[in-house]
């Protein structure tokens, strides 16, 4: 897929894979990269537009979508990883809130823009969704890829 000149949104763009995805999109000539983060993010490239967005806050996510004029590529990257043994309901709920329902909320909020541009959605999942580790089984549940 060519993203030269396209508008790209990366969630979880403040560090790690998300930050690398922003750099990669810029390197491939994206015209605009929206960097979705929970905390404000400064970036030296003028093509980067920081968007303060907590994916677990549906109202904020919807409001953020209203700030974006057009979007061609949505990269759902935001995620968390916590140690758990499935006996801690709070850890399971946190994984689901961010890694499953957060992805859902972002996709729903930006879907009208993507439909208009006939855009693309990329969900960044984990190999641990295919082979869960005993130290973090709850992480694997919402990150599992699904096929139609």
Question: Which role does the model predict for each range below?
Answer:
Residues 78-83:
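Conserved NAD(P)H cofactor-binding loop of Rossmann-fold oxidoreductase domains
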Residues 85-96:
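Short alpha-helical oligomerization interface
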Residues 126:
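Residue(s) in the substrate-gating loop at a strand-loop-helix junction
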Residues 56-69:
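Conserved Rossmann-fold cofactor-binding substructure of NAD(P)-dependent oxidoreductases
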């Amino acid at each position: 897929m060519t993203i030269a000149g396209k508008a790209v949104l990366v969630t979880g763009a403040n560090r790690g894979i998300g930050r690398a995805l922003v750099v990669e999109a810029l390197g491939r000539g994206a015209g605009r990269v929206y960097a979705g983060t929970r905390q404000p993010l400064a970036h030296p490239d003028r093509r980067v537009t920081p968007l303060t967005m907590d994916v677990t806050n549906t109202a904020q996510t919807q409001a953020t979508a209203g700030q974006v004029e057009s979007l061609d590529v949505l990269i759902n990257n935001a995620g968390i990883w916590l140690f758990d043994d499935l006996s801690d309901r709070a850890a399971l709920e946190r994984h689901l809130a961010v890694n499953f329902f957060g992805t859902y909320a972002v996709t729903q909020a930006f879907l009208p823009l993507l439909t208009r541009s006939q855009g693309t959605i990329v969900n960044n999942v984990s190999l641990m969704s295919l082979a869960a580790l005993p130290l973090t089984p709850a992480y694997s549940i919402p990150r599992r890829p699904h096929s139609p």
